UniProtKB/Swiss-Prot annotation:
It is found in: Cytoplasm. One of its GO terms (cellular component) is cytoplasm. Pathway: Amino-acid biosynthesis; L-lysine biosynthesis via DAP pathway; LL-2,6-diaminopimelate from (S)-tetrahydrodipicolinate (succinylase route): step 1/3. It comes from Photorhabdus laumondii subsp. laumondii (strain DSM 15139 / CIP 105565 / TT01) (Photorhabdus luminescens subsp. laumondii). The lineage of its organism: Bacteria, Pseudomonadati, Pseudomonadota, Gammaproteobacteria, Enterobacterales. Keywords: Acyltransferase, Amino-acid biosynthesis, Cytoplasm, Diaminopimelate biosynthesis, Lysine biosynthesis, Repeat, Transferase. Belongs to the transferase hexapeptide repeat family. This is 2,3,4,5-tetrahydropyridine-2,6-dicarboxylate N-succinyltransferase. Its EC number is 2.3.1.117. Substrate binds at R104, D141. The gene is dapD.
Length: 274
């Protein structure tokens, strides 16, 4: 794996000169191998190591290189044709392979090659971009977008129209992460490498980026870029110091543990916020 990483990093340093015509076989083979490993879930752009999320920047480099070294090509769909550098993930799947990998794909859901979909997932008409990792038992509901390299945990529900931000450039940026057992309400947007920690519930229409204030009403603490585990979050506003205006924020209205979440439905958690 170290050799593969070295090839990718060296090629990325010289990416300005790379084209489909000039790329050498070693680089092309390395990029193809990485995309296939991402596609199968054997590699992932980010993973939790000793309780901390670690981003493997060289894998993002490989994804970016794939755009430089591949020509656009015709992609056949059920109702149209497409023209792009990245093949669709399911273009060569047959019934046997779908049954073996154990997830459902409802038309016209789309996933690009290099995205991993684990067992018992359901893709309603949605979009999963290259480098994304969707773990077991997750529902990706209608019109949801899972951005490039985003990391979605086990037993997550991404409700209708949710946007999970992608990140390929700038290279140093970290992917957006939704940890296990989270619920993201309809039309919410989680972007810019924000981490939603395990067991959190995000209400409908909540927008969180790196600059969004995440206000804990119980403690008065303000978080940035991270929703603590077990938080129930709704949209809100915080007043300016002089009281002349207010600005949007996300409000942590309560904390719940796994036991409570198991006994109480999501709707109940969101309704009883007073």
């Amino acid at each position: 794996m170290q050799q593969l990483q070295s090839i990718i990093e060296s090629a990325f340093e010289n990416r300005a000169t790379l084209t489909p015509a000039t790329v050498n076989h070693e680089t092309r083979d390395a990029v193809t191998q990485v995309i296939n490993l991402l596609d199968s879930g054997k590699l992932r752009v980010a993973e939790k190591i000793d309780g901390q999320w670690v981003t493997h920047q060289w894998l993002k480099m490989a994804v970016l290189l794939s755009f430089r070294i591949n020509e656009n090509q015709i992609i056949d769909g059920t109702e149209s044709r497409y023209f792009d550098k990245v093949p669709m993930k399911f273009s060569d799947y047959d019934q046997t392979r779908f049954e073996k990998e154990g997830f459902r794909v409802v038309p016209p859901a789309a996933a690009r090659q290099g995205a991993f979909i684990a067992r018992n997932c359901v893709l309603m008409p949605s979009y999963v971009n290259i480098g994304a990792y969707v773990d077991e038992g997750t529902m990706v509901d209608t019109w949801t977008t899972v951005g490039s390299c985003a990391q979605i945990g086990k037993n997550v529900h991404l409700s209708g129209g949710v946007g999970i931000g992608g990140v390929l450039e700038p290279l140093q940026a970290n992917p957006t992460i939704i940890e296990d057992n989270c619920f993201i309400g309809a039309r919410s947007e989680i972007v810019e490498g924000v981490i939603i920690e395990e067991g959190s519930v995000i209400s409908m229409g909540v927008y969180i980026g790196q600059s969004t204030k995440i206000y804990d009403r119980e403690t008065g603490e303000i978080h940035y870029g991270r929703v603590p585990a077990g938080s129930v979050v709704v949209s809100g506003n915080l007043p300016s110091k002089d009281g002349s205006y207010s600005l949007y924020c996300a409000v942590i209205v309560k904390k719940v543990d796994a036991k409570t979440q198991g006994k109480v439905g999501i709707n109940e958690l969101l309704r009883s916020i007073d």
